[in-house]
């Protein structure tokens, strides 16, 4: 049986959940739920769901904290995945998510809020190397995915009301509260695993690169790269403890030069100087399998952050998930 490890890389993308920006930057969903994964066994099915919650009142200029930006940002995201082992080496998954809320609270208590479906993710993975002995299990998996936006990326909110006529003036909501960026993105993924079954110990790593596309507004949010190093051990038969060291990088935003000349960036509520960041974090996780089910919980703790301009910083990230695996045909033996 091929290896499928439920070890959330807290965000494939915590960046995808709130990203960067003055009046906020990128938006979208955590690609593939952040799961560090190999492939399923042939004709094995996995159905997974997780709830990811972000809350922060931490904002930064470069690597220094600031209190003159926003009061709070929070989001709650439901991620779902259906994966199928087409062959012993090839797994196909279809993934999607829904934001219950993406809320930005200003210094005066004013709130900007949105919700809705985010993206559809088609994510095939192929096991390019497997070698098992009595003492070790090795696996290398590569993946190439596509993110297709389904949700809103252009929405507005009331900015003021004329006291005499009652007429309402609207402004575009900042990208950070939009459920998606409105662009097609390509996902490049690598996963390497070594396990020591007798010792119930495992080490593994993943690398992710997301090449962001252009949306209809002439915006291209910054590319994303992440590397995760994991170590895990099983205690008391089924209790899995995993610790991840994660580094991530988000590039600056690009935009069509014509919308810059026309002053549309201000109308779009975007400050391109406040996009992009670097972060190092540790992510502890606890998982517990029971029969065909697995339950897991994790949280992310940033060790170092740097943002371009003035931007939202990572503070609290929490994930609770469950997965169910079964075979479409009865296994021999």
Model-inferred region functions:
Residues 21-23, 36-44, 89, 130-139, ...:
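Short loop/turn motifs that connect adjacent beta-strands in outer-membrane beta-barrel proteins
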Residues 41-43, 74-78, 114-120, 138, ...:
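Residues that define the transmembrane beta-barrel architecture of outer-membrane proteins
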Residues 42-55, 169-263:
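Detector for outer-membrane/organellar transmembrane beta-barrel domains
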Residues 45-49, 92-94, 122, 138-144, ...:
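Transmembrane beta-strands of outer-membrane beta-barrel proteins
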Residues 51-57, 96-102, 128, 146-152, ...:
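Transmembrane beta-strands of outer-membrane beta-barrel pores
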Residues 52-77:
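Surface-exposed strand-loop-strand hairpins of Gram-negative outer-membrane beta-barrel proteins
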Residues 58-60, 66-68, 218-333:
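Outer membrane beta-barrel transmembrane domains
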Residues 104, 110-206, 212-213, 269, ...:
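Outer-membrane pore/translocation modules
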């Amino acid at each position: 049986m091929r290896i499928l490890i439920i070890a959330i890389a807290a965000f494939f993308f915590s960046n995808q959940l709130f990203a960067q920006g003055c009046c906020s930057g990128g938006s979208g969903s955590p690609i593939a739920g952040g799961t560090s994964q190999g492939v399923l066994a042939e004709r094995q099915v996995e159905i997974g769901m997780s709830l990811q919650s972000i809350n922060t009142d931490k904002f930064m200029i470069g690597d220094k904290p600031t209190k003159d930006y926003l009061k709070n940002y929070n989001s709650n995201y439901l991620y779902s995945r259906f994966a199928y082992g087409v062959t012993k080496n090839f797994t196909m998954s279809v993934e999607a998510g829904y934001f219950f809320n993406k809320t930005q609270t200003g210094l005066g208590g004013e709130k900007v809020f949105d919700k809705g479906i985010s993206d559809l993710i088609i994510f095939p993975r192929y096991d390019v190397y497997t070698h098992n002995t009595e003492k070790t299990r090795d696996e290398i998996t590569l993946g190439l995915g596509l993110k297709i936006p389904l949700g809103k990326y252009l929405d507005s909110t009331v900015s003021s009301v004329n006291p005499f006529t009652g007429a309402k003036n609207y402004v575009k909501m900042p990208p950070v509260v939009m459920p998606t960026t409105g662009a097609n993105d390509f996902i490049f993924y690598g996963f390497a695993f070594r396990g020591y079954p007798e010792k119930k110990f495992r080490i593994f790593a993943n690398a992710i690169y997301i090449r962001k596309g252009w949306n209809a507004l002439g915006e291209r949010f910054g590319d994303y790269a992440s590397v995760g190093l994991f170590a895990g051990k099983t205690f008391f038969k089924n209790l899995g403890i995993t610790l991840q060291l994660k580094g991530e990088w988000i590039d600056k935003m690009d935009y069509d030069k014509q919308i810059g000349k026309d002053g549309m960036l201000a109308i779009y509520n975007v400050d391109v100087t406040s996009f992009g960041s670097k972060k190092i974090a540790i992510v502890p996780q606890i998982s517990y399998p029971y029969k065909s089910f697995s339950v897991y919980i994790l949280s992310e703790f940033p060790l170092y952050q740097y943002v371009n301009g003035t931007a939202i910083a990572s503070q609290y990230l929490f994930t609770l998930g469950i997965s169910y695996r079964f075979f479409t045909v009865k296994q021999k033996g």
